[in-house]
Amino acid sequence: MNEFKYLGKKVNKPSKQLDTFPKPKNITHVMFEGEELTCLCPVTGQPDFNTVVIEFEPDKLCLESKSLKLYLWSFREEAVFAEGLADIIVSDLFKALKPFGCKVTLMQNIRGGLQLTAVAEKKR
């Protein structure tokens, strides 16, 4: 089994490290969904609240969920548009997991009466 940096340990700060582990034999699709992804509007500095759906088709690796939580937490103080954030997340996940495909759907909470959904996808 892999050595996990965060799993089973007390952690009180965000991290950009994504821990992985070997994919179980019959797993073909993995999906995470969370409603607590926050970042800052790069124009106003106001917080943006997002729901994120992460899907990937693993080749050899799966993603350890605690490291993902800490990774998503790391954006709390970053100023970035939703479209840019979706692109950053899919790129980082693709680099760490080397999956057949990865898709990130980011749904920003309604602001000014508009619902924004940004989808970023990478495939081999």
What are these regions (language model features)?
Residues 1-124:
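N-terminal intrinsically disordered, cationic/polar leader segments
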